[in-house]
UniProtKB/Swiss-Prot annotation:
Protein name: GTPase Obg
Location of the OCT domain: 358-436
GO BP terms: ribosome biogenesis
GO molecular function: GTP binding; GTPase activity; magnesium ion binding
Domain of life of the source: Bacteria
Cofactor(s) essential for the protein: Mg(2+)
NCBIfam families: Obg_CgtA, Obg_CgtA_exten, PRK12296.1, PRK12297.1, PRK12299.1, small_GTP
Reported function: An essential GTPase which binds GTP, GDP and possibly (p)ppGpp with moderate affinity, with high nucleotide exchange rates and a fairly low GTP hydrolysis rate. Plays a role in control of the cell cycle, stress response, ribosome biogenesis and in those bacteria that undergo differentiation, in morphogenesis control.
Pfam families xrefs: DUF1967, GTP1_OBG, MMR_HSR1
UniProt-annotated binding residues for GTP: 167-174, 192-196, 214-217, 284-287, 319-321
Species this chain originates from: Streptococcus gordonii (strain Challis / ATCC 35105 / BCRC 15272 / CH1 / DL1 / V288)
GN (gene name): obg
EC number of this enzyme: 3.6.5.-
Amino acid sequence: MSMFLDTAKIQVKAGNGGDGMVAFRREKYVPNGGPWGGDGGRGGNVVFVVDEGLRTLMDFRYNRHFKAQSGEKGMTKGMHGRGAEDLIVRVPQGTTVRDAETGKVLTDLVENGQEFIVARGGRGGRGNIRFATPKNPAPEISENGEPGQERELLLELKVLADVGLVGFPSVGKSTLLSVITAAKPKIGAYHFTTIVPNLGMVRTQSGESFAVADLPGLIEGASQGVGLGTQFLRHIERTRVILHVIDMSASEGRDPYEDYLAINKELESYNLRLMERPQIIVANKMDMPDSAENLKVFKEKLAANYDEFAELPQIFPISSLTKQGLATLLDATAELLDKTPEFLLYDESEMEEEAYYGFDEEAPAFEISRDDDATWVLSGDKLEKLFNMTNFDRDEAVMKFARQLRGMGVDEALRARGAKDGDLVRIGKFEFEFVD
């Protein structure tokens, strides 16, 4: 059995835009050729694409860094640099993508072929053709390409199944799955036999089919991470119907009704919406001597403690060993699926329509701090973007950047903080003197 990996943390880096070019037209019969430098090409995006052939996030265990190519530099004759190809990263169906820093859900990838840009490439820098004006017809200025977006992502795989089998360890879920489907889970008589979700397809006598997931056995405290914890509870989220399997033989000395309450408590603690899914109680191991009496007591306790206005869940006595009651159970499950809508895992408001790539309009344009060596340090997304796109090899570009800082109010803010003529100011690794 291959290792099942259902979470992964990765780094993605989109390509930088290509640098714009400073060039001038120099031809024999064109005395005033003017600027001729083209724009840089767009950097490549990092794009997730759903591949139905993948079953786990195993590919991300050893490959955690994904970097798209940068765009080409602008060329003479006003020609643009070539844009970079997007980097395609294939993920399995059922992958939820979160921003690792904020925890915000970026997308939920469930359809085969579905695409989502997780990091957008930077635009190409402008060549000097773009900066020509009547006052400056031959500008010696260009822009560097915009840096591509870089972010850390958390991937979570939640299996795609219509029906989920839940219950304490060793209640017979794996055996049940193997009997009703062609799945061949590893089975043993010890706790946490199932350490990965097993999937199988069921076909009823009437010809209806649905996917069933045998989810690892739960114990009390799983919703708080005890035992195998929430790493398996997440797989229940996509199911529409829950088959709650209970060992009616009480062969391990536990009370079937207490088991029923404990599992439901874990489902409710993990996510309140799990309890909105319809449940069918599967009374398993009815071929054992004490099962019939235990089922009678179970029904009495259930009726006595259930809300009088609520509908009691259906109970189906079965035996996975003798196949007693299986056909009736599967027909009822298919019927319940037909009238149960899909449950959205996330509200549309919780998800980004597209990953956010610009600087935050509500964030300050710049921030000022002071280092231990008395150097003033400027930071901020907008300021750093302007800095990164400035070509400091060109005097005109440096002067333009200085005007931009002044227009943003950086000079006034430094004076207000007490900056004096000659003080060092740092942006990233670049230092310059403050001139009052």
